[in-house]
Amino acid sequence: MFVRIGFVVAASIAAVTVKRLNVKPSKPSKPSDNGEGGDKEQSVDPDYNLNDKNLQEEEEEEEEEVKLINSVINQTRGSFSDYLDDDILPEFEDLLSGEIEYPLPDDDNNLEKAEKERKYEVEMAYNDGELERLKQLVKELEEREVKLEGELLEYYGLKEQESDIVELQRQLKIKTVEIDMLNITINSLQAERKKLQEELSQNGIVRKELEVARNKIKELQRQIQLDANQTKGQLLLLKQHVSSLQMKEEEAMNKDTEVERKLKAVQDLEVQVMELKRKNRELQHEKRELSIKLDSAEARIATLSNMTESDKVAKVREEVNNLKHNNEDLLKQVEGLQMNRFSEVEELVYLRWVNACLRYELRNYQTPAGKISARDLSKNLSPKSQAKAKRLMLEYAGSERGQGDTDLESNYSQPSSPGSDDFDNASMDSSTSRFSSFSKKPGLIQKLKKWGKSKDDSSVQSSPSRSFYGGSPGRLSSSMNKQRGPLESLMIRNAGESVAITTFGQVDQESPGTPETPNLPRIRTQQQASSPGEGLNSVAASFHVMSKSVDNVLDEKYPAYKDRHKLAVEREKHIKHKADQARAERFGGNVALPPKLAQLKEKRVVVPSVITATGDQSNESNESNEGKASENAATVTKMKLVDIEKRPPRVPRPPPRSAGGGKSTNLPSARPPLPGGGPPPPPPPPGGGPPPPPGGGPPPPPPPPGALGRGAGGGNKVHRAPELVEFYQSLMKRESKKEGAPSLISSGTGNSSAARNNMIGEIENRSTFLLAVKADVETQGDFVQSLATEVRASSFTDIEDLLAFVSWLDEELSFLVDERAVLKHFDWPEGKADALREAAFEYQDLMKLEKQVTSFVDDPNLSCEPALKKMYKLLEKVEQSVYALLRTRDMAISRYKEFGIPVDWLSDTGVVGKIKLSSVQLAKKYMKRVAYELDSVSGSDKDPNREFLLLQGVRFAFRVHQFAGGFDAESMKAFEELRSRAKTESGDNNNNNNNNSNEEESVN
C-alpha cells in the first residue's frame, strides 16, 4: 500500500516536471523582427538554465524522498511490478500520451512560425485544460498523501505497540508461573498447617494420656509398697517354714540311711536264699541224674553179668570197628578240610599279591611294552601265574623300597598269614577233641554230671559239622578288627554260600529274633570251651567275619568308581532276585523233592531228645526242663546220610538252536580247568568288568541321558524344538514356585544279612536239606558238567536266541534241589550264567515297558487329574528304567561282549530308542488331554486352575522333549495348538490390561 502511494507521488512529480520542460521552450513572444526575436531567445536561455537546475534539485529531493519511503516500506517490494502494471502505468501513459515537440530549424521560418503559433494556441488551450485537470489531480494526491502519512504514522505506532504487547505477554507468563509457585507453596503450607493442627490435637490427647499414666504409676507405686510390706512378712514366715522343713529333711535322711541299710541286708538275705534254692535245685537235678545213671549202670551191669565172654568180645569188637570207621571218616573229613584250607590260603595269598600289584599299577606304574602286568594275570591265567605274581610283587616292592610309602591304603594290602595258628588249632582239635572235656580238674559233682554226656559231646565236638565258625573268641575278634582288601571282599562276596554241605553250627553274631532263624536253645558245641585252640575250621568263621567287615572297603579303596560300582551291584542283585523269583514261579511246583525234604516247608523244628549209648531215652520232669532252660543248651542227634533218598541222574535235554546259526559251540570261551597246584582265577568284580588300565586314567562317565540318535526309529522323525524350550522358560519365569525333579534312580538295596541269616538258619536247624543237596552233588555231577559245557560254549548274535537259551537253562536247573548250593561244588561258569540271565531279564523288562507305553490309551471317561497322574507315573517309570540302564550301559556292554551276548538292543537305535519314541507319543496324548481340558474348563483367562493346567502340560512336554531328544511332527502339532491357546489367553489379558489402563487415564 505504502509503496503504491510513494510510487504514485513520484510518478506525478515526474510527469509535472516533464510537462514544464515541454511548455517553457514553446512560450516565446509573437514573431517580430529577427533582432527582437533573437534578443528574446537570448533573454529566455538563462531562465531556462536556472529552471533546469531547480528542476534537477527538485528531482534529486524527490528521489531521496522516494528512496526514504522505499527503505521504510521495503517489505512489500515484491508487489511493485503488479502495481506498476495495474495502476501507475496507465496513468503515466495518459500523462505522456501527448507528443513532445521540440523546435527544429527550418528555412521557411514564417510558415513555420505561423504553423507554430497555430499549434501553440491549440496546445495552450489544451494545456490549460490539462493543467486544471493536473492541479485537481495534484490536490487529490496531496490529500491522499496526507492520509497515507497519517496511516503510516498510525502503523508505526501499532508496530511499537506490538513489541510492547510481546513484552507484556512475556511478563504475563512469568507472573503466571510465579502465581503457580505461590499457589503450590500455599497448598503445602496449608497441608503443613493441617498436619500441625492434627499433631497438636494428638499432642493434647497424648498429654491427657500421660497425665492418666502418671496417676496410674503413682497408684501402682503405692500398691507396690503395700505388696512389698506384705511380702516381707510372708518371706519371714517362709524362712521359718523352710528351716523347719530342713530339720525334718535331716531327720528323714537319717531314717533313710537306716532303712537302706536294712533293705540291703534284706536283699543280701534274699540273694543268699535264692543261691541256696538254686544250689538245692542243682543238687536235686544232680541227684536225679545220678539216680538215672545209677539205674542205667545197674542195667548195664545186669546185662553184662548175663552176657558171656564171647558176647562181650564180639560187642567190643563191633564197637572197635565202629570207632575205626568213624575215625576213618573223621580223618578223611579232616584231610578234606585241610586241603580246602590249603587251597583257600593259597588263593588268598595269590589274591593279595595281585591286589598289591594292581594297587601299585593303579597308583604310579606304567607297564612297559611287552611286559606282563597284574591286570593280565587277572585275565589270562596259567599254572605259572602264581610265580609271575610273586615276581611282580617283589619287583614292585623293590622299586618302592626307600621311598617311604606312607599310603594309608597299604594297610589293606599287607598279607597276613592266617595259616599257621589255624592249622595248629585244627590239628590240635582233631587229635584232642574227645578228651577236651576232661582238660580241667572239676569237682566230683561236675565230673559225674559230664560223665553221661562225654560221649555225645565228643561226637558233637569231633563232628565236621562243627567246622562252621569254629574259631576261638580271640580269633574272631582279631578277624573282626582286620580289614580286608577289595579283591578279598570280591572273593568272599558269596561267603554266606561257601559253607560245606555237612556243616551246621552256632552263630554268635546274628540276632536271635530274626524271622528266618527260630529262637531255639543253643547247641552245646566245642566253641563254648575256653581253650584257645578250639574249632576245626576257623577259616569259615574268619571269612564270615571278613564278609561283614569289608562291606564299605570298596568305597574307601576306590572312591572314583564307588557310585558306578554300587549301581552295578544293586542292578545285579535286583536282576538275580527277579530271575530266582521267575524261576521259582515257573518251575517251583513241578520239582519232585524227596520225602525228607518236605520238612523244609514247615516252620516247626523238632529238637530230639538225648539218646544214650544203650538206646534208652532220658525222661526228665518239668522241673528239670526249667533248670535246663537257664543254661540255654541242647543236644543234637547225628543224622545219617542213608535216610535221604537219592534221585537218579538226569539226562539234559538238548539246548535250543537258532535257525540262523546264532549259537556256536566251538568258541574259546570255556577255559580249561587249572591243575591242582595252580591258583584259582580271581573272581570278577560284581556287576562289572575289570578296573580301567592305569595309564588311561579313570573311565569316562556314562553319557548323559541325552537325545535320541538320528537313526533311531527310522530317519529324522524326531528333531529338536527350540520353541518348546523358549515357551517352557517363559512360563517358568512367571511361575514363582519351582517343583523339584523327581528322583530318577530307585535303587533297591539287597539285604545280604537277611540272606545270610536264612542260610545260617538252614545250616543250624535244617540239616535234611543239606543232606539232600549232598545227594544231588553226588548223583547229578554229569548233568551239571554238561550244562556248564553248554554255557561256556554259548555265543549269540540275536537276543531272541539268548532268551530261549536262558529259558532252557532255567528249566534244566530247576531239577536241582537248590541251584546255588549244588553248583558251587562244581566248576560252574557263574559269571557268564549270571550275565546271560541279566541280559535276558533286562531285555524282557525293556520290551514290557515299551509295550506298556506304546499300548497306553487315554481313557476319556476318566477325570482330568487321575488321567494326567497316570501318564505322569508312566513317564517316571520309563525315565527311571532308561536312566538306570544308561548309567551302567558301558560296563554292561563290555561285560556282555566278553561273554558273547548281543548288545545292539542296548544302543539308542534299539529298544531304548523305541521307548523314547513311545514317550513322545505319550507327550502328544498328554498335551491333547490338557488342551481338551482347557477348552472344557469354564472361567476367565486369569483363572489359576487354567494357568496351572497349562503350565503342567508344558512341563510334561518339556520333560519328554529333553528325555527323547525332540518331537515328531504330530507332537509338534499338538504343542503348537497348546501354545496358540496360551497366546490367545495372554493376548486377551494384555487387551484387558490396556483397556483398564486407558480407563484409568481417562478418569485421571
From Swiss-Prot:
Subcellular location(s): the record lists: Plastid, Chloroplast outer membrane
User: Which residue ranges are recorded for the region named Leucine-zipper 1?
Assistant: 269-290
Q: Which positions are tagged coiled coil?
A: 123-341
Disulfide cysteine pairs (residue numbers) = none
The record describes the protein's role as:
Required for the positioning and movement of chloroplasts. Interacts with profilin and actin independent of its polymerization status. Regulates chloroplast localization by anchoring chloroplasts to the plasma membrane and forming a bridge to the actin cytoskeleton.
The written remark on domains in the entry is:
The N-terminal region (1-25) is necessary and sufficient for targeting and anchoring the protein in the chloroplast envelope membrane. The coiled coil domain(123-341) interacts with the plasma membrane and anchors chloroplasts firmly on the plasma membrane.
Question: What GO biological process terms does the UniProt entry carry, in alphabetical order?
Answer: chloroplast relocation
Gene encoding the protein? CHUP1
Q: Where is this region: Disordered?
A: 22-63, 398-482, 504-536, 612-718, 736-755, 979-1004
Point out residues bearing the modification Phosphoserine.
S399
Spell out the protein name for this chain: Protein CHUP1, chloroplastic
Question: Record's superkingdom?
Answer: Eukaryota
Q: Low complexity bias: where?
A: 427-439
InterPro entries in the cross-refs: CHUP1/IPGA1-like
Say where the protein is mainly found.
plastid
